[in-house]
């Protein structure tokens, strides 16, 4: 169902996990369709996890879990997601970095909500990369939905078409729907990985992958094909700048100040 992270063929030693979860809709009583304020007494069933899918970056093997995988528990209570929440947490505990679309706002918080509900320990809090945040911060796509970005970039855009009936049929125990849900969940990983690989060279706040490597390495992708690319200057310092030949990041700089002590003494700055 899941396994330890790999070193991506020796290219990168950081364990980067891409993942996606699918959840059941809440079931509530309402007096109408629009502008409803749902009180706690109107809640029939809170949302719960249906499936999750994950893969290690640049590795072909995909891991997943779903409620029907645990037949005895599913037969006893088809809404009890403890086993699949635990299996996802176990996999994430092996990761240095996790990647998801809207992961910081939804997936990570939602997972912790279920962990505390079931009395399970917190995950080891790997660093996170949220491709939705990247899209909003660094680009101006007409839509920041994962599918729409994939279509715009022409990467992994052939996603299975679904509607709400798929979720409803899973909740109602339709096994064909469950198989379709797993396929849908797994297929989300394809555009997620391709988009992440395209975007990471544009990020200035990516977790520094250089700390996982020996010698010089790109902070965004861990690649070692760095070429000198001019200089980066601050008001008081000068640093070597590099371009990564693997991900295209051209904003890498060394940490050594190239200005000697005498030159720095002669520098003047504005008082305000």
Located regions from the model:
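Metal-dependent phosphoesterase core characteristic of DEDDh/y 3'-5' exonuclease domains
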Residues: 2, 14-15, 47-60, 65, ...
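Conserved RNase H-like, two-metal-ion catalytic cores of nucleic-acid enzymes
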Residues: 2-92
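Long, charged amphipathic helices and adjacent flexible linkers at domain junctions
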Residues: 209-210
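Residues immediately within or flanking Cys/His clusters that coordinate Zn2+
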Residues: 213-218, 241
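Short cysteine-rich clusters marking metal-coordination/redox-active sites
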Residues: 218-221, 244-247
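Short, non-ligating residues that shape and space the ligands of small metal-coordination modules
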Residues: 225-229, 253-254
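Short linker/helix segments within small regulatory modules
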Residues: 230-241
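Short metal-binding segments enriched for Cys and/or His
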Residues: 246-267
């Amino acid at each position: 169902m899941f396994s330890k992270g790999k070193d991506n063929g020796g290219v990168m030693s950081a364990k980067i996990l891409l993942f996606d979860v699918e959840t059941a809709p809440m079931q509530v009583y309402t007096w109408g369709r629009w502008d409803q304020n749902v009180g706690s007494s109107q809640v029939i069933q809170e949302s719960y996890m249906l499936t999750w899918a994950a893969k290690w970056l640049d590795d072909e093997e995909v891991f997943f879990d779903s409620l029907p995988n645990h037949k005895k528990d599913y037969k006893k209570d088809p809404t009890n997601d403890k086993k699949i929440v635990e299996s996802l947490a176990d996999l994430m505990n092996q990761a240095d970095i996790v990647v998801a679309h809207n992961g910081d706002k939804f997936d990570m918080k939602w997972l912790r909500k279920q962990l505390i509900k079931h009395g399970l320990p917190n995950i080891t809090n790997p660093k996170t990369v949220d491709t939705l945040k990247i899209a909003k911060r660094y680009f101006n796509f007409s839509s920041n939905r994962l599918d729409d970005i994939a279509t715009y970039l022409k990467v992994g855009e052939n996603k299975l078409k679904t509607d709400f009936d798929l979720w409803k049929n899973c909740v109602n125990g339709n096994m064909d729907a469950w198989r379709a849900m797993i396929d849908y969940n797994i297929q989300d990983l394809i555009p997620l990985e391709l988009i992440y690989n395209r975007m990471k060279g544009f990020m200035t706040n990516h977790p520094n992958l250089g700390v996982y490597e020996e010698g010089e390495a790109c902070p965004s992708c861990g690649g070692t094909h760095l070429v000198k690319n001019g200089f980066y200057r601050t008001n008081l310092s000068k640093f070597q700048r590099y371009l990564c030949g693997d991900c295209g990041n051209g904003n890498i700089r060394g940490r050594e100040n190239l200005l000697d002590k005498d030159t720095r003494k002669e520098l003047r700055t504005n008082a305000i």
